[in-house]
UniProtKB/Swiss-Prot annotation:
A GO MF term: structural constituent of ribosome
Function: One of the primary rRNA binding proteins, it binds directly to 16S rRNA where it nucleates assembly of the body of the 30S subunit.
Record's keyword terms, sorted: Ribonucleoprotein, Ribosomal protein, RNA-binding, rRNA-binding
InterPro entries in UniProt: Ribosomal_uS4, Ribosomal_uS4_bac-type, Ribosomal_uS4_CS, Ribosomal_uS4_N, S4_RNA-bd, S4_RNA-bd_sf
Gene3D superfamilies xref list: Ribosomal Protein S4 Delta 41, Chain A, domain 1 (1.10.1050.10), RNA-binding S4 domain (3.10.290.10)
NCBIfam families xrefs: PRK05327.1, rpsD_bact
Gene Ontology terms: cellular component: small ribosomal subunit
Positions of the S4 RNA-binding domain: 91-154
Gene: rpsD
Full protein name: Small ribosomal subunit protein uS4
Quaternary structure, from the entry: Part of the 30S ribosomal subunit. Contacts protein S5. The interaction surface between S4 and S5 is involved in control of translational fidelity.
Amino acid sequence: MSRYTGSIWKVSRRLNYSLSETGKELIKRPYAPGMHGKKRIKAKDYGLQLQEKQKVRFTYGISEKQFKKIFKDAGKLKGIHGEMFLFLLESRLDNVVYRLGFAKTRQQARQLVNHGHILVDGKKVDIPSYSLRVGQIITLKEKSKDLIIVKEALANKLNRVDYISLNKELVGKYVRIPHRDELLPNIKEQLIVEFYNRK
């Protein structure tokens, strides 16, 4: 399954979950896409597991193939599988660029990385899935600071997170691994574990 590039607003309403983490998609039309939305049917176990997986996959904007690979990688780490999975998703370079406020959306952040605007420890990294390590430094190329999308994003004053720092010179740092309560509080990651572990 390829990465979804359509409207996250429609997907948010379908899942009844804010993929932008702002809640804006659900304010005006808190129902599924369609004339008046489709009647919500109570999901069974499989449906709940699938829905939870889709919420997280669409939040981070990655393909099913990538998503499943990260899930498998998380299973090799010490710790609770579901939590390790969220930590790996959160440490992706495109996500951290978004968290730093260099882009308004993760999709924009992915484009910045793809087009070579981002440096990690002073070296260009153009792989959105690059997994950052604690202590690494993330910056924009000097010329890239003048990009309109970057200026607009920085002016947006996104609520930044404590595990990623940013100074006045726009030097970002992946300070520490986030705590579980700092990530997607409305997500039940155990349902995703059950989805992939089902027989």
